[in-house]
Amino acid sequence: MVVTFTSRRSEPVLLRPARPTPRETKQLSDLDDQRTLRYYETVVGFFRRCDGGAAGAVGAPADPAKAIRAALAEALVYYYPVAGRLREVADGGGAGNRLVVDCTAEGVVFVEADADVRLEDFGQPLLPPYPCVGELLCDAGDTRAVVGKPLLLMQVTQLKCGGFVLGFHICHNIADGFGMAQLIMAIADLARGEPAPTILPVWRRDLLTAARLGSGAVARTPFASAAAASASASSPALQNGARRAAAAADAMLSTPPDRMVVEYFLFGPREVSYLRGQLPAHLADSTTVFELLTAVMWRCRTAALGYGPDLRVRLMITMNARGRWNAHTPLPRGFYGNAHVSPVAEAAAGDLLGRPLADTVELVRRTKRGMTRERMSAMVETVAQLREWPPSSMDRVYEVSDIKWTTVNLLKFGWAEFAGGGIPLAGDLTSKLGSDHTRCKNSAGEVSTVVSMLLPRVAMARFKKEMAVLLNKDDKKSLTIMSSL
């Protein structure tokens, strides 16, 4: 039985930094300043009280919400741009106004709430989708309007068991997933009693700009010619016409939101082992779980959407530039801006579906491992020119992100431990068109991966049939955890 509840919320307050902070204007990187990132990302995190962490125990606050509020105000002293506001400035480049951050210390939104439910009521194990998730988040208004608004909105919901839920909206132009996690980790550090965040924040957005990385390189990706076409089609009428044509040809763009459905697919060790068994030995041993599941999801999605065999389909893989692969352009520890680059794989739909799974896995691996400094520079240059990625002329694009490692060993309050969470089906729906790979534990306590998938309702039924064939499962219901509309 799915639990239902209503949270009792306090009035929202604007929480300012605990001490005076610099008043200045900060520039964003070219990756930060994408029009496609002008929205609020939504994240929820569930926490349980540690043993001995009941109210009144040494080190455990009687009121977690007030402790987190004080820690957030202190964290904003270090992350003071987050307490500011975005402003548009004219840009002569023809791609529209740029954003800058005015560090005004106006503050972020904070809400305290209570709910008459326990942590275990959200499910055992704790897996998405989360019931009544809207009750765990404060109202962000229009999540596509970011100029002149608070950049962070946080709600702390206290549960009957002593646990609590952090629910927040944060403007994606300010931080990516790792940056968001770093900010929340700083709050946890300070709530635990540390004198300063374990990792001090670094702004340095100039490191990911075309001016810094520019090499004049041409992006050798399937998007190169289309990116050039997007740049040359400066007429709004031409751009709007191209978008309408793409939407008409792609059910992902033409289906109304009320006819879409999100489902979450759980892959434990047994499912992953079965899929590896369909690969040659050399590939089965070296392929990561992310690469394997990405290939599987892309194939099933392509089949479910019924693309013609000659149509080109694309896979866009979000990669973290803080990773070991990026030894050529290292980012300093503490960098919390957008540092994701997104190489693209492309294939004809008929070829993708007609060839063995191993070929798709190989394509995914080549795409990931082909992200050189030259390609990274070319992508940043393209983003600087178009202010978006992928170019709006692209269609039939499936984006995947691996966020399994953003919460590992993070969020240690001392008196509370992270129990689960991630990106829920709430807030801006257009940001949920891709798939997120999240780490969790299944009912047997085994480390597993949950992958989200948003599709038109009719296509979802076909998707589950394709997945059942790959996993050799008769019961398609056993493939998913639960669906969300």
Swiss-Prot record:
GO aspect biological process, one term: defense response
Listed GO MF terms: acyltransferase activity, transferring groups other than amino-acyl groups; hydroxycinnamoyltransferase activity
Domain of life: Eukaryota
Residues at the catalytic site: 172 (proton acceptor)
Keyword Acyltransferase listed: yes
UniProt cross-references to InterPro entries, sorted A to Z: CAT-like_dom_sf, Plant_acyltransferase
Protein keywords: Acyltransferase, Plant defense, Transferase
One Pfam family here: Transferase
Gene3D superfamilies associated with the record: Chloramphenicol acetyltransferase-like domain
Tissues and organs where the protein is expressed, per its UniProt entry: Highly expressed in young panicles. Expressed in leaf sheaths and panicles.
Transmembrane segments: none
Enzyme class: transferase
Record-listed E.C. numbers: 2.3.1.-
PANTHER family in UniProt: ACYL TRANSFERASE 4, OS10G0105900 PROTEIN
Family recorded in the similarity comment: Belongs to the plant acyltransferase family.
Function recorded in the entry: Involved in defense against pathogens. May contribute to disease resistance by potentiating disease resistance signaling, or producing phytoalexin-like secondary products.
Additional notes on this entry: The gain-of-function mutants Spl18 (T-DNA tagging) show a lesion mimic phenotype, express constitutively PBZ1, accumulate the phytoalexins momilactone A and sakuranetin, and display enhanced resistance to rice blast fungus (M.oryzae). Plants over-expressing SPL18 show a lesion mimic phenotype and display enhanced resistance to bacterial blight (X.oryzae pv. oryzae).
The protein's name: Acyl transferase 1
Gene field: AT1
